[in-house]
Amino acid sequence: MNVKGRVFKYGDNVDTDVIIPARYLNTSNHKELASHCMEDIDKEFVNNVKDGDIIVANKNFGCGSSREHAPIAIKAAGISCVIASTFARIFYRNSINIGLPILECDEAVKNINHGDELEVDFSTGIIKNLSKNEQYQGEAFPEFMQKIIDNDGLIGYIRNK
């Protein structure tokens, strides 16, 4: 599976309280969550994000409270994948479980800028920076995780099994 999109870049330790603030956790409506995604760190995110865009961040993305709402809000906002140097483990698991592709690749994060255009191949882990004509090698998903992503998350995977 390949995705192509424009980059929104963030720093270290972007926590789940910033991704979707606790004041919005009283809803499970995905569109409502998406409308507040990243608003405490990037007020214009929801106005500028387009389907297929990509979040790139430094280390420890998704740290903080364990809430499935965070990857749901990101995915519902139209983000096709998140690339970071490292992820908080619970965010990593929650993302895979809801079908949000995420890749760790420190080299890519160091070289990608806000607004760059990327193409990502999840089967190989290759990240192409089309703006800079560069390529980085991320870690490809193991086959079973790729199947979960391909089925839009763990529930879809089990339903289709």
Curated annotation (Swiss-Prot):
E.C. number: 4.2.1.33
Protein keywords: Amino-acid biosynthesis, Branched-chain amino acid biosynthesis, Leucine biosynthesis, Lyase
Stored Pfam families: Aconitase_C
Keyword Magnesium annotated: no
First-level EC class: lyase
GO molecular function: 3-isopropylmalate dehydratase activity
InterPro entries in the cross-refs: Aconitase/3IPM_dehydase_swvl, AconitaseA/IPMdHydase_ssu_swvl, IPMI_Swivel, LeuD, LeuD/DmdB_bac, LeuD_type2/HacB/DmdB
Pathway membership, UniProt: Amino-acid biosynthesis; L-leucine biosynthesis; L-leucine from 3-methyl-2-oxobutanoate: step 2/4
Listed SUPFAM superfamilies: LeuD/IlvD-like (SSF52016)
Catalytic activity: (2R,3S)-3-isopropylmalate = (2S)-2-isopropylmalate
GO biological process: L-leucine biosynthetic process
Subunit structure: Heterodimer of LeuC and LeuD.
Purpose of the protein: Catalyzes the isomerization between 2-isopropylmalate and 3-isopropylmalate, via the formation of 2-isopropylmaleate.
HAMAP family: LeuD_type2 (MF_01032)
Family designation: Belongs to the LeuD family. LeuD type 2 subfamily.
Listed name of the protein: 3-isopropylmalate dehydratase small subunit
Source species: Clostridium botulinum (strain Eklund 17B / Type B)
